[in-house]
Amino acid sequence: MIGPKAYIAKDKLERNIKNIRTYIGPKKLMIVVKANGYGHGLLNVASILSSQEDIILCVFNIQEAILLRENGVRNNIFIFSRIQQDWVIRAFELNLWVNICHWDDLLLVDRIISETGLCPKIHLKFDTGMTRLGFDITDSEKVFTFLSDRPKIPIEGIYSHFSTADEGDISFA
């Protein structure tokens, strides 16, 4: 079976990044390379982008993040999937950014920071209708109260995945 094929040209990808920067200025970019770069090749795309320190590479799981680290990628790497007890300490050791989307995740991170002193960069995810991962938006005050009592938990950012952003009516998004 013959299917679509994508070719990634280093110079064109770099030019696209430069063009984006003309609109956003000197800000960090989070570029999704998960699922093997959506078929473009995780290592291929990451090797092109990793020359720019202010690019954060987003992967789905710890295995993709480890593969990037093993291949010399020093950029910040953000893992979209929910943290797991069996790999979270390894993520902290590799200085990976993690997704916190459930109360159990917060409790786990709080315990690990207390026990190990390792301090990862954390992004909180709130569910805004996608219903996959994320704190319920009605719990936001409780989450922030919990965190205000624990200043050692380093929150780098807050994000969501808008479920209807690509539809005609964006009032919910």
Spans of features found by a protein language model:
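Active-site-proximal beta-alpha core segment in soluble small-molecule metabolic enzymes
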Residues: 4-8, 12-15, 25-173
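Gly-rich Lys/Arg/Thr-decorated short loops/hinges at beta-loop-alpha junctions or inter-strand turns
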Residues: 1
